[in-house]
Amino acid sequence: MSKSICSTGLRWLWVVVAVLIIDLGSKFLILQNFALGETVPLFPSLNLHYARNYGAAFSFLADSGGWQRWFFSGIAIGICVVLTVLMYRSKATQKLNNIAYALIIGGALGNLFDRLWHGFVVDMIDFYVGDWHFATFNLADSAICIGAALIVLEGFLPKPTAKEQA
């Protein structure tokens, strides 16, 4: 017996589309309007700064000769497949988990697009305090982190009883 897509977590795939549009749109604007390394202050402690990341988070493996592009692309594809299956197997009413999965999928696909199209990930958010700068990141990274935090949060929330689920 097949399930209706609307009865599964796949109902929340619109979040993936929203993350992709916002992420890729912001990266397009940076690529069109900034020179590599250019910085524009937005607020105290927050700049727009065009950077290229050839590695993973915090530029992990950025100087590894190119193989990491395909390695991280494979990981992103694998994560997207696993989370999509989890969304299909879950109920549409499990909002927190499905939104979390969709945020992670959207972020992973945004960075995957960059890796495959450009050969690097476009980063642009530079958060700093005084002279200390956090690693430059993008909106896809933010979506992934928020999704992961929601999964952790869900683990601390009380589970509904069988009576409440009925």
From Swiss-Prot:
Subcellular location field: Cell inner membrane
Residue spans crossing the bilayer: 12-32, 70-90, 102-122, 137-157
GO MF, one example: aspartic-type endopeptidase activity
Keywords: Aspartyl protease, Cell inner membrane, Cell membrane, Hydrolase, Membrane, Protease, Transmembrane, Transmembrane helix
Pathway: Protein modification; lipoprotein biosynthesis (signal peptide cleavage)
Membrane topology qualifier: Multi-pass membrane protein
Active site: 123, 141
GO biological process assignments: proteolysis
InterPro entries from the UniProt entry: Peptidase_A8
Enzyme Commission identifier(s): 3.4.23.36
Catalytic reaction list: Release of signal peptides from bacterial membrane prolipoproteins. Hydrolyzes -Xaa-Yaa-Zaa-|-(S,diacylglyceryl)Cys-, in which Xaa is hydrophobic (preferably Leu), and Yaa (Ala or Ser) and Zaa (Gly or Ala) have small, neutral side chains
GO cellular component, one term: plasma membrane
Function: This protein specifically catalyzes the removal of signal peptides from prolipoproteins.
Similarity remark: Belongs to the peptidase A8 family.
Protein name: Lipoprotein signal peptidase
Organism field: Klebsiella pneumoniae (strain 342)
Gene: lspA
